[in-house]
Amino acid sequence: MNKSFGSHPLPVASLGAATRAVGVVPGRDLVRARTLANGLRVLIWPVHDIPNVALYNWVRAGSRNEAPGITGLAHFFEHMMFNGTARRQPGEFDRLMEAQGGANNAFTSDDVTVYQDWFPRTALDLVLDLESDRIADLAFVPQVIESERGVVASERRLRVDDNNQGLLSEQVQASAFVAHAYRFPTIGWPSDIQSWRIEDLQRFFKTYYAPNNLTLILAGDVVPEEAFALVERHFGPIPRQQPAELLRAREPEQLGERRVLLRRKAQTPLLQYAFKAPAAADPRGPAVSLLLSTLVEGDSSRLHRALVEEKRLAVEVGGHWHEGFDPGLLWLYLTLPQGSDVEEVQRALDLELSDVAAHGVTDAELVRAKNMTAAGFWRKLATIDGKAQLLGEYEVFHGDWLKLFDAPAQFEKVTPAQLQMVASEILDRRRRTVGVLVPEDSEA
């Protein structure tokens, strides 16, 4: 799970009411949760505003569950899950979904793979049949595997190999971690993509695509007991599997700054900072989110104002916090003007970060960050898709969906002193990895 911000402004709630009225999140008493005998965790949030349903199937499998030689497998299943089962042909999942007026998508991260469906309430039985079918009887057809292997290799070239920002991020992340599997790229290393064996796929699927490793979320126009009965009918017969081994690797303390320098065909230099940061469930989480917001969210953020508008040292700033199961990274990334002196930009950036670490942010900056966070939370919660996503995030990453309904209050409680303490802990030069990409003909 990533919380990302660019330099584009977002609507800001009024300074008074938005952050004072955040404590009451409706819907807590409507949500129903149940765990099937096979371990499948099911959460249902009935919302009858429109006759539609959002389904999120969270699989606890990401690049953190991989190893050298099989990197990219979690992402590969994002492709394979749409390519046939014992009962259905490749592409039939999409065709049946679209025939009902529905749509679907999926994404993979360092920690999870998530499958998303949006459909009319009348299609609930069919969609649960489709979803359970591909968990129970996914097909492993060699020709399909080879075809999708080529698709993933092309995707990697587009997103990483031929994308300077993506390539630099991959190299920075691989340098930031020395022991933990977060060092692996989600899409996989090129040599691994070309060498997965069918046995690797089958072993990974059996281990992680088991009901006791899934969390199924339904939000929308459903009656909970009827929906639970349908889930039981379709998913109940799927046997649980032996739980995956717990990951034992723990990233050692980083003792000094690490640096990555790439020379590539490029119009403009790029600069990235990746600081070691807490896991999603860490109590400091709200303060980390607000810190990132004050730094890079919107045109009035600290770094946009200082580096883009005032000093003209960057054309764009952004950032994200990888909120994972384990401690991850807080990223800052800057796109620089042509011909920039990267060292000059770094000095200016370090000056701003040192000031925040030493003195915190102003009261106005913190209020603004809280308002923007509250506005974003309520915008997402206004849709059934947002409800399904947030319910899943809190159940999977925070261990309890009930924490969703206390989230706005937790953000509101963050004090300037707490934010400054978190800033001083995270924005430590000894715990960061710096990535620089310069044009090939640059003297940097």
Model-flagged regions — what are they?
Residues V47, Y56-W58, R157, A174, ...:
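His/Glu-based metal-binding/catalytic segments typifying zinc-dependent metallopeptidases
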Residues G84-R87, W118-V151, D299, G318, ...:
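M16/insulysin-pitrilysin zinc metalloprotease superfamily fold
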Residues N2-L15, N83-T85, V127, R159-A210, ...:
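Scaffold signal of the M16-like zinc-metallopeptidase fold and its non-catalytic homologs
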Residues N2-V24, V31, T215-I217, L334-T335, ...:
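C-terminal regions of mature proteins
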